[in-house]
């Protein structure tokens, strides 16, 4: 028998390597392009000359503690409690732990498997009984990209779970700040509404006196009474909104009941305004801060892994198999020697009769990869649009607040003139009531505008993917953007 030459062995190995490399799925190319700068800029502070004033810089690192810019110790404590006690975030972290444990068995299918077994049996003639003990070895080599595709699929699942943890953290912090601001704004509005109700009650009293003196009509009294009723109805709606926000905040903190002070009718001071921003976060930074983009990236990785597996299935599957059997004749009380020889050999699975089905599956997985790539680009565009929309809303609320401030100045000047006329006996208390109510109404609208501006900041930070990075994600190695075959 002629021995195989070393050159033939090298040639065979080279051919096997080439075939293995050809089976790899191509590296997916995703469109990561983004504008160099934002179209909108949060220049929401101006000096006396009307020029925008520089704000505090906001970098990517600052997104992890964005709520602290309100300088509110109570808000900071609530966010810390939510991050430690929220059940949705805890579930997401639990799924992350589960997926990391599963990562340890991602390559198990392509590692040598050793198994053993014992059994008793009879021969065909039912004359002798045997005791068999065997050791079996099987090793799927995972050629033609099967091993790498399986690793990629497992990595995609981990990336997806990490993105879900990030999404839960972003949504949690934004919701906590949102509900807290709702409560504080409702408590501040409570004081303004109380003043308005008192002013409307005084208006009704004075109109009744003027009606008795035939200086006004019954219709005027009815109109003032209707206005008083509407103010009281708004009072009730405000209380309902405060209660709803308090219970929602309690759920976010993992509590069954809200803190009593969240439901108090306190005439608290107006919540502090958010400082001006100098946004240093670029559109390209969204690729690593927004959870939905990370989820879309995981979908691309998962689709690429599935394509790699389906393409590897188009090629023969090679595995090594071996078995060692120990046989003992129980009837004759002696060891048999006919079956004790070890068996070692390859197992080859060649796709012949089902090759068409496998080809169709590979084509379908390739189409699924194209869809995932388009979905990734869509998520990038949506992320950029969300930030631009939040910036536009922030600018609009700033302009609205400036107009209301100018209106408040005019109302205050008018009221000062009427107050002076009243001191001189040239005007009555009744003549000032309309101006006082207009001032209260404008103050209430200013409070609403400031609340809307604060919520616009919350929307901006949420669109930027701002949230603290959980310790479980900080300890993880940054995921690779892709593997080259």
Language-model segments: what does each one mean?
Residues 2-81, 155, 239-288, 294, ...:
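Terminal intrinsically disordered/low-complexity segments used for targeting and assembly
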Residues 147, 163-282, 393, 397, ...:
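Periplasmic alpha-helical coiled-coil/stalk elements that build and connect Gram-negative outer-membrane
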């Amino acid at each position: 028998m002629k021995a195989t030459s070393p050159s033939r062995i090298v040639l065979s190995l080279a051919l096997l390597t080439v075939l293995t490399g050809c089976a790899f799925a191509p590296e997916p190319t995703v469109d990561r392009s983004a504008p160099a700068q934002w179209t909108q800029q949060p220049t929401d502070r101006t000096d006396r000359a009307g020029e925008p004033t520089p704000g505090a810089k906001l970098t990517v690192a600052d997104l992890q503690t964005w709520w602290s810019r309100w300088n509110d110790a109570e808000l900071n404590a609530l966010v810390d409690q939510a991050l430690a006690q929220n059940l949705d975030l805890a579930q997401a972290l639990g799924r992350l732990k589960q997926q990391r444990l599963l990562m340890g068995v991602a390559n198990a299918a392509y590692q040598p498997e050793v198994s053993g077994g014992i059994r008793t049996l009879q021969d065909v003639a039912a004359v002798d009984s045997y005791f068999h003990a065997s050791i079996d070895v099987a090793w799927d080599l995972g050629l033609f990209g099967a091993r790498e595709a399986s690793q990629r699929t497992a990595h995609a699942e981990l990336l997806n779970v990490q993105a879900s943890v990030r999404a839960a953290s972003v949504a949690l912090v934004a919701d906590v700040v949102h509900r807290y601001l709702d409560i504080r704004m409702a408590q501040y509005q409570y004081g303004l509404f109380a003043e308005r109700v008192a002013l409307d009650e005084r208006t009704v009293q004075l109109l009744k006196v003027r009606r008795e003196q035939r200086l006004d009509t019954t219709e005027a009294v009815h109109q003032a009474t209707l206005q008083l009723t509407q103010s009281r109805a708004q009072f009730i709606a405000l209380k309902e909104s405060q209660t709803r926000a308090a219970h929602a905040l309690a759920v976010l903190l993992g509590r069954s009941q809200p803190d009593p002070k969240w439901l108090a009718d306190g005439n608290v001071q107006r919540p502090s305004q958010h400082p001006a921003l100098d946004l240093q976060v670029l559109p390209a930074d969204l690729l690593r801060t927004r959870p939905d983009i990370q989820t879309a990236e995981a979908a691309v990785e998962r689709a690429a892994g599935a394509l790699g597996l389906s393409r590897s299935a188009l090629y023969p599957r090679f595995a090594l198999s071996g078995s060692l059997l120990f046989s003992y004749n129980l009837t004759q009380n002696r060891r048999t020697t006919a079956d004790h020889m070890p068996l070692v050999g390859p197992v080859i699975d060649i796709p012949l009769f089902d090759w068409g089905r496998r080809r169709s599956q590979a084509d379908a997985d390739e189409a699924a990869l194209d869809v995932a790539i388009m979905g990734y680009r869509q998520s990038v565009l949506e992320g950029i649009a969300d930030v631009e929309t939040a910036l536009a809303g922030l600018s609009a609320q700033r302009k609205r607040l400036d107009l209301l401030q100018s209106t408040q100045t005019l109302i205050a000047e008018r009221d000062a003139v009427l107050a002076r006329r009243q001191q001189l006996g040239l005007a009555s208390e009744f003549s000032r009531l309309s101006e006082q109510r207009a001032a209260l109404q404008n103050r209430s609208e200013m409070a609403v505008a400031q609340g809307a501006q604060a919520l616009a900041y919350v929307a901006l930070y949420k669109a930027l993917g701002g949230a603290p990075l959980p310790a479980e994600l900080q300890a993880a190695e940054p995921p690779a953007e892709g593997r080259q075959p």
